[in-house]
Swiss-Prot record:
Function, as annotated: Transcription factor that activates the expression of the EIF2S1 (EIF2-alpha) gene. Links the transcriptional modulation of key metabolic genes to cellular growth and development. Implicated in the control of nuclear genes required for respiration, heme biosynthesis, and mitochondrial DNA transcription and replication.
Protein's UniProt keywords contain DNA-binding: yes
Family: Belongs to the NRF1/Ewg family.
This protein's UniProt keywords: Activator, DNA-binding, Nucleus, Transcription, Transcription regulation
Protein name: Nuclear respiratory factor 1
Post-translational modification: Phosphorylation enhances DNA binding.
Location(s), subcellular: Nucleus
Primary subcellular site in the record, as a coarse category: nucleus
One Gene Ontology CC term in the entry: nucleus
Assembly and binders: Homodimer. Binds DNA as a dimer. Interacts with PPRC1.
Signal peptide: none
Length: 52
């Protein structure tokens, strides 16, 4: 059983997984990008992330 979880603490995203699949890597990249973008945006702005 693959276990993966994300912890968001102090604006730092850490992805831990037992299997580094391409999908996991893609989600990790998107999560890191979202955190980086949110740190640059003003309060009240909205980040929308869509996965197809």
């Amino acid at each position: 059983v693959e276990q993966n979880w994300a912890t968001l603490q102090g604006g730092e995203m850490t992805i831990q997984t037992t299997q580094a699949s391409e999908a996991t890597q893609a989600v990790a990249s998107l999560a890191e990008a979202a955190v980086a973008a949110s740190q640059e945006m003003q309060q009240g702005a909205t980040v929308t992330m869509a996965l197809n």
